[in-house]
Amino acid sequence: LKREGIIAFFSKQRTILVLYVLLATALSLSNFNKGQTKVFSGDTKYTFYNNYVIFKHSFFHLQQGKDLYVLFPETHWDLYKYSPSFSVAMAVFAYLPDWLGLLLWNLVNVLILFYGVRYFIKGPPHTIFMLWFIFNELFTSVLNSQSNPMIAGMLVAAFTFFEKDKVHWAALLIVSTFYIKVFGILAALLFLFYPNKWRFILWSAIWTVAIGLLPLMFTSTDGLIFQYQNWLRLLSEDHSGSIGYSFMGVLQTWFGLQSGKDVLVIVGLIITMLPFVFVHKFKDLQYRINWFASLLIWLVIFNHKAESPTFIIAFTGIALWLFTTSINKTVLVLAVLAFVFTSLAPTDLFPASIRHSFFEPYAIKAVPCILIWLYLNFQLIKSGLNKSHKIFGIEK
């Protein structure tokens, strides 16, 4: 009876919600209390919530007409890389004391992810397992005050809105992710699965313009054009930077491949688009879920700037697939690999010597995600070929 009671307690969505909130609260206060003691380079010390400081100050820089996309070493380390519109959203937090603003920022991220998964089209008990499965990965992202949980939650919610034929809300969420991190716009490909395609395109255009012009509340037209020009410049320059925990990172560190990043991304896009050939599968919910899960993984492993906190997006995709699909030996092995080497590898469960000498330089965190992405797309294409002799709805 006690065992059943414990299982029932931890199977309640309210229990998980409380734990998510406690996670955000504890990590926020812990990082705040560490003060300015973190050194990224040189002798200057910054906070342990540097990302939040970057986001917060972007609003003040927008107001002051400063170039958002240059370094401000007097307040924070690294560059601001999101859109001018995102800096407007940070107005909600900008005037709050850091301890409160940081707490609310992390709570917003955690709650958007929680409710995005909570209201996923499949519902309980699938969502209960999903929320537990991603908990540790969420820890890593919140620890870094990142926006990735928000992006994951918004994209999952967009999928659910598509399923419920609420394309205006799906469009809003997808366009919003674009103004946070550009790659989120690829989720717009979901519209190919559903009717009312022109309605989605129209709403996407409306939201793109509306959100894109938000900074005009705090800057002039010329000032906004200036910021967007600088943002585009940063994105173009940023593309030639590091390879991160990405597919390219694995190919480079494992096999010595030093070039071909653009080719790899194009090949990845082609593979991602192939399942749309099988129009007859569009009515299959699991087919749509699997493709969406594959996309969430793609957004990370083909992102040359992918860092450990980014993987909450890919891991959410893995959770959506794992707890809605039929379990076989291959699926089980892939799930264990993902949980151990993607989610647990950066933690203290593994000695620091192994993490720094093996896991990090060889981008081990990305490997299970790459394997699952390949497996998912193989299954999608195999399913499309085996179940029908039609391609693009036409008999072969």
Task: Indicate residue ranges for each PLM-predicted region.
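Aromatic-enriched
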Residues: 31, 35, 322-396
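Primarily membrane-embedded glycan-assembly and transfer machineries that use lipid-linked glycans
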Residues: 2-169, 193-308, 315, 388-394
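Transmembrane helices and adjacent periplasmic/lumenal helix-loop junctions
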Residues: 174-191, 303-313
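Alpha-helical membrane-embedding segments
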Residues: 163, 186, 190, 211-216, ...
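Hydrophobic/aromatic-rich transmembrane helices and adjacent perimembrane loops
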Residues: 307-322, 366-367
